[in-house]
Curated annotation (Swiss-Prot):
This is ATP synthase subunit beta, chloroplastic. InterPro entries: AAA+_ATPase, ATP-synt_VA_C, ATP_synth_F1_bsu, ATPase_a/bsu_AS, ATPase_alpha/beta_chains, ATPase_F1/V1/A1_a/bsu_N, ATPase_F1/V1/A1_a/bsu_N_sf, ATPase_F1/V1/A1_a/bsu_nucl-bd. The gene is atpB. The lineage of its organism: Eukaryota, Viridiplantae, Streptophyta, Embryophyta, Tracheophyta. It holds the Pfam family ATP-synt_ab. One of its GO terms (cellular component) is proton-transporting ATP synthase complex. It is an enzyme of class 7 (translocase). NCBIfam families: atpD (TIGR01039). It is found in: Plastid, Chloroplast thylakoid membrane.
Length: 498
C-alpha cells in the first residue's frame, strides 16, 4: 500500500515548486493551465492554485487534471469554488494524485473531498495519507467465498441477507427510517464484528448531513469525549459544492475504508448516500470537459466510472468492505441509465415502505419487495431458505386477502385463510425490532438478534405453536422468547384490570 507523508496543504501529497504552470482559461469549475514544454502533469495529478484575489483575500484551490489538450496545456476540474481566480495565476503541479488522511484518527471526524477536517475540532492527528486513485484488488487477493454478513436485524437477515463484501441498494423516500437503519448497521458492525464504518455523503443536502452528525453524537455512534471510541468517519461533498468535489468524494470515503480493510484487516461498512449524485456529478463534469453526451444526456463513460468505484468495494483475504448505497431513482424510472447501471453491481436490495412506517412497524423494510442473491439453499442452507419462503408466502397471501377483508370483514374468510391472516399479522409485527440507536428516543433497549434465533422464532410462528398468543406480544421485541414473556405479562395485566 502506498503511504505518503502529509504536507502543509491537506489533500496534496508533495509540492514540487519547480513545476509551475499558469492559468490560461477559466470556464466555471474547469481550468485550462499552460505548462513549460516537457513539464506536463499526468492525468489525475493534483494542481494547487495559491495566491490572492483582487480584494486581497487568500486563495487556495485544488484541481485535478482530466485532459491533456496539446500545446502544453491541460484541462483540470476544481474541487472548490473558482471565485477570485484570474488568467495568468501561478499553478503548482504536486506530481501526485489527491491524497487523504487514513487510519484510526479519522474516526468521529467530518472531512471534505480533500481530506480536510470541516468539524472545527482541529487538525487530524495522523501522518498517514493515501491517494484516492488506486486499482481494484488483483484477482489473487480476492476472497471468493460466499458468506452472509449478519446484521442482527431480523427482517434483513431472514428475507434479504447481505453478502460479506457485497453491495446493497437502499431504496426509500424521506422520513421512512433510512438514517436510523444506517446508524443501527454502523452500531452493530462495531459491536458484533469489531468493524468500523465510513459514511460518504455524495451530493445530498447539507441539512441532512448535519442531522446525521447530530443524531450520531446523540446515539453514541460518535463519542465526543473520546473520538477514538467512535465507530464511523464521515466524508461530505454536499449538493452546493462544485461537480468535481461531488464526483470525487465517493473515492475519498472509499480510500479511508480501504485502509481499514487492507492495513487494519477489519470488516468495514461503506455507506454512499447517494450513488445517483455520483453519476450526476460525473455527467456535469463530462459536459464541462466537452465530451459528447450519451443516452438521456449522461456521460459516455458512465459504465466505466461506476465500475471503477464499485470494483474497489470487495472482500480480500485481509478483510472486507460491505457497501450500502442509497439509490435515488429519477422520476421513479428504473430504466434510467443511472439506476440501471447501479443495479448491475448490487447483490441485495433493501426497500423501505411508507405503508409499514405509517403502521409503526420499524424498521420499515418491505419483506416482499426486498431481494437478495444470497437467499439460495446452497448458500444459506435449506432451513433458512424454507423459512424465508414460507414467511413470504404467508405475507403475500395476507396482502391478497386485504381487499376482501376491507369489503366483507374477517368473518367472511375461510377457517384456513383466517389462520393465515392471524399468523401473517404476528409475522409482520415480529419483523419489527427495537434499535440500539433509537433507545435515546424510545426508551426501550435495543436488541441484536442472531440468525439462528431469528429462524427459530419464525418457524415457531409458522408451525402454529404460538397461535394462542396475542399479536401485540410480537411487536417491537428481540427473539421469540421475549414475545412469549411479553404475552404472559399482557395476560397478567389484563387479569389485574378485571
Amino acid at each position: 500500500m502506498k503511504i505518503n507523508p502529509t504536507t502543509s496543504v491537506p489533500g496534496v501529497s508533495t509540492l514540487e515548486k519547480e513545476n509551475l504552470g499558469r492559468i490560461s482559461q477559466i470556464i466555471g469549475p474547469v481550468l485550462d493551465v499552460a505548462f513549460p514544454p516537457g513539464k506536463m502533469p499526468n492525468i489525475y495529478n493534483a494542481l494547487v492554485v495559491k495566491g490572492q484575489d483582487t480584494a486581497g483575500q487568500q486563495i487556495n484551490v485544488t484541481c485535478e487534471v482530466q485532459q491533456l489538450l496539446g500545446n502544453n496545456r491541460v484541462r483540470a476540474v476544481a474541487m472548490s469554488a473558482t471565485d477570485g481566480l484570474t488568467r495568468g495565476m501561478e499553478v503548482i503541479d504536486t506530481g501526485a494524485a489527491l491524497s487523504v488522511p487514513v487510519g484510526g484518527a479519522t474516526l468521529g471526524r467530518i472531512f471534505n473531498v480533500l481530506g480536510e477536517p470541516v468539524d472545527n475540532l482541529g487538525p487530524v492527528d495522523t501522518r498517514t495519507t493515501s491517494p484516492i486513485h488506486k486499482s481494484a484488488p488483483a484477482f489473487i487477493q480476492l476472497d471468493t467465498k460466499l458468506s452472509i454478513f449478519e446484521t442482527g436485524i431480523k427482517v434483513v437477515d431472514l428475507l434479504a441477507p447481505y453478502r460479506r463484501g457485497g453491495k446493497i441498494g437502499l431504496f426509500g423516500g424521506a422520513g421512512v427510517g433510512k438514517t436510523v437503519l444506517i446508524m443501527e448497521l454502523i452500531n452493530n458492525i462495531a459491536k458484533a464484528h469489531g468493524g468500523v464504518s465510513v459514511f460518504g455523503g455524495v451530493g445530498e443536502r447539507t441539512r441532512e448531513g448535519n442531522d446525521l452528525y447530530m443524531e450520531m453524537k446523540e446515539s453514541g455512534v460518535i463519542n465526543e469525549q473520546n473520538l477514538a471510541e467512535s465507530k464511523v468517519a464521515l466524508v461530505y461533498g454536499q449538493m452546493n459544492e462544485p461537480p468535481g468535489a461531488r464526483m470525487r468524494v465517493g473515492l475519498t470515503a472509499l480510500t479511508m475504508a480501504e485502509y481499514f480493510r487492507d492495513v487494519n484487516e477489519q470488516d468495514v461498512l461503506l455507506f454512499i448516500d447517494n450513488i445517483f449524485r455520483f453519476v450526476q456529478a460525473g455527467s456535469e463534469v463530462s459536459a464541462l470537459l466537452g465530451r459528447m453526451p450519451s443516452a438521456v444526456g449522461y456521460q459516455p463513460t458512465l459504465s466505466t466510472e461506476m465500475g471503477t468505484l464499485q470494483e474497489r468495494i470487495t472482500s480480500t483475504k485481509e478483510g472486507s468492505i460491505t457497501s450500502i448505497q442509497a439509490v435515488y431513482v429519477p422520476a421513479d424510472d428504473l430504466t434510467d441509465p443511472a439506476p440501471a447501471t447501479t443495479f448491475a453491481h448490487l447483490d441485495a436490495t433493501t426497500v423501505l415502505s411508507r405503508g409499514l412506517a405509517a403502521k409503526g412497524i420499524y424498521p420499515a423494510v418491505d419483506p416482499l419487495d426486498s431481494t437478495s442473491t444470497m437467499l439460495q439453499p446452497r448458500i444459506v442452507g435449506e432451513e433458512h431458505y424454507e423459512t424465508a419462503q414460507r414467511v413470504k408466502q404467508t405475507l403475500q397471501r395476507y396482502k391478497e386477502l386485504q381487499d376482501i377483508i376491507a369489503i366483507l370483514g374477517l368473518d367472511e374468510l375461510s377457517e384456513e385463510d383466517r389462520l393465515t391472516v392471524a399468523r401473517a399479522r404476528k409475522i409482520e409485527r415480529f419483523l419489527s425490532q427495537p434499535f440500539f440507536v433509537a433507545e435515546v428516543f424510545t426508551g426501550s433497549p435495543g436488541k441484536y438478534v442472531g440468525l439462528a434465533e431469528t429462524i427459530r422464532g419464525f418457524k415457531l410462528i409458522l408451525s402454529g405453536e404460538l397461535d394462542g398468543l396475542p399479536e401485540q406480544a410480537f411487536y417491537l421485541v428481540g427473539n421469540i422468547d421475549e414475545a412469549t414473556a411479553k404475552a404472559t405479562n399482557l395476560e397478567m395485566e389484563s387479569k389485574l384490570k378485571k
